[in-house]
From Swiss-Prot:
One of its GO terms (molecular function) is ribosomal large subunit binding. It comes from Xylella fastidiosa (strain 9a5c). It is found in: Cytoplasm. This is Ribosome-recycling factor. The lineage of its organism: Bacteria, Pseudomonadati, Pseudomonadota, Gammaproteobacteria, Lysobacterales. Pfam families: RRF. Its main location: cytoplasm.
Length: 185
């Protein structure tokens, strides 16, 4: 039972870190990346469809993306979705090809994005600490119901703390990496 609590806590912490990575992938750096457009949805065939399901996205040169729409009739919808996104990009449409030129980030915008990245990192740390709190509470509940001894509680809490420290260190590394990527001109 104790191992199950630890495993559950570790799984939840890993999911939090993965969610942070996915979230930070949509933060625009100076370089073009297809993951930048992951959050864009197109009204297609009666539902909201992710852009990567109606078009292929590739990097052309260092600062531009080329979107090749599979269905020619979808080009206008894709263009509208890009305008509607908060990425601040202007698409150039030529038939089924859509070109996105990413302007270089200003120093001010880089600092704003660094703050956003730092804030997301802090939110993830809070989530990890909440997972630790939940796991420790489950361990204490087991003690109350006399399923485990005090020594096992202490050992379980130490193990959960080690998992937490490792997860928070991982969050710090992800945030630091993204901040360096942002500040690189």
């Amino acid at each position: 039972m104790l191992n199950q609590i630890k495993q559950d806590a570790q799984d939840r912490m890993t999911k939090s870190i993965d969610a942070l990575r996915n979230s930070l992938a949509s933060v625009r750096t100076g370089r073009a990346s297809p993951s930048l457009l992951d959050g864009i949805k197109i009204k297609a065939y009666g539902t909201d469809t992710p852009l990567n399901q109606v078009a292929s996205i590739s990097v052309s040169e260092g600062r531009s993306l080329v979107i090749t729409v599979f269905d020619k009739n979808m080009s206008k919808d894709v263009e509208k979705a890009i305008y509607a996104s908060d990425l601040g990009l202007t698409p150039t449409v030529v038939g089924t090809l859509i070109r996105l030129n990413l302007p270089p980030l200003t120093e001010e915008r880089r600092k704003e994005l660094t703050k956003v990245v730092h804030s997301e990192g802090e939110d993830t740390k809070v989530a990890i600490r909440n997972i630790r709190r939940d796991a420790n509470q489950q361990i204490k509940d087991m003690l109350k119901s006399k399923e485990i001894t005090e020594d096992e509680v202490r050992q379980g809490e130490e193990d959960i703390q080690k998992l937490t420290d490792k997860a928070i260190k991982s969050v710090d590394e992800v945030v630091k990496s993204k901040e360096q990527e942002l500040m690189t001109v």
